[in-house]
């Protein structure tokens, strides 16, 4: 069973709130999950300590069992001070390298 560490959306329309969950990779985004390991509230200021709350010990456990975080969750985990496995770091670097930068509307009109 492939396991992912990802965000599950909650909250109301225009007021998102996310849970950081451990879920089967084939489960729906807001469907069943194995464990809740944190929260993310994008409505709070970026310097607010309650914006991202993670259970570091449980995340370390799941990473050691082979769970793969999504890109956004991997960024949260790194900021929290948890070291990511080498294979996850490498995947993130490859994705960032292959990401295409599109010109803005202003740049495309100017040329």
From Swiss-Prot:
Entry keyword Calcium: no
Q: One GO molecular function term?
A: structural constituent of ribosome
Q: Which biological process annotations from GO are given for this protein?
A: translation
Q: InterPro entries, per this entry? A: Ribosomal_bS16 (IPR000307), Ribosomal_bS16_CS (IPR020592), Ribosomal_bS16_dom_sf (IPR023803)
Q: Name one GO cellular component term.
A: small ribosomal subunit
Q: Quote the Pfam families the UniProt record gives.
A: Ribosomal_S16
- Which NCBIfam families does the UniProt entry name for this protein? S16
Q: Which family does it belong to?
A: Belongs to the bacterial ribosomal protein bS16 family.
Name of the protein described by the UniProt record: Small ribosomal subunit protein bS16
**Species whose genome carries this gene:** Rickettsia typhi (strain ATCC VR-144 / Wilmington)
């Amino acid at each position: 069973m492939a396991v992912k560490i990802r965000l599950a959306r909650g909250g109301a329309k225009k007021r998102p709130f996310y849970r950081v969950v451990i879920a089967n990779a084939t489960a729906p985004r807001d469907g069943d999950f194995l464990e809740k390991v944190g929260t993310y509230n994008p409505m709070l200021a970026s310097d607010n300590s309650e914006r991202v709350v993670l259970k570091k010990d449980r995340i370390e456990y799941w990473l050691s069992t082979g769970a793969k975080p999504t890109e956004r969750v991997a960024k949260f985990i790194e900021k929290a001070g948890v070291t990511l496995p080498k294979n996850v770091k490498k995947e993130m670097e490859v994705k960032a390298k292959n990401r295409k930068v599109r010109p803005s509307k202003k740049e495309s009109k100017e040329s």
